[in-house]
Amino acid sequence: TLDEIKKMTEKIGPLVQLSLTGGEPFLRNEFTEISDLFYKNCKPLYVTIPTNGSLTDRIFDYYKFFLEKYPKINFRCVFSIEGIGAEHDKLRDVKGSFKKIEDSYNKMYSLRKKYKNLVLDSNSVFTANSEDTLLGTLKYLEKNFNFDNISVTYARGNIPDENLKTLAKKKYIEINDYVDSIERNKEGRIFSNIMRGINSITRENVIKVGFEDKFVNPCVAGKKIVVISETGDVFPCEILG
């Protein structure tokens, strides 16, 4: 409940990074009220919210409201994109979903031009279903959109369909080499530069851990990271949730 979230946020203390995720976060009716409690009580420096772009007006109104209310917070809106056009619709099993992303991006870009504390990113998941087409998807996004960052997530953890996981190391490296090459030419907003550094380290660690089964560094889950579910359950990280 909102009252429970209020009490919780009053005890958490200041946050460096806050991620508000789903499912689709903007589907929740109280999402604005929940966000405001975190922003007011935890004073995060950086906020990341992934979205499928399906609720264009709600997404736009949300960011317009909070960009004006909290000018010291750096917001990152991340569009989840798995393919182009019909391919994305098929992978998401929702007809017209890619058009929704285009509509939401175009409307959000007007805010990006006005507010320096907003970055627009895309994220795609590297799986067995996408490994052969993902490079083409990323090249299309780079040519037809103006995202601050284009990132790739490696399928991991408790994924319902284990067949979606893959060990195609060569393709993963090729795709991330491309991502690395285009990042160098992008505008350097503060959140953009931070995310590029994080993405670079993450890519290296995924190759070592996911493909080469190497130990990289001690786990900090539960110490520097915590995950709170929509029901209030607390976990040290996504994997252990």
Predicted regions and their residues:
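Conserved alpha-helical substructure of the radical SAM core
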Residues: 1-75, 161, 170-171
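Radical SAM enzyme [4Fe-4S]-AdoMet core and its adjacent flexible, acidic
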Residues: 70-235, 239-241
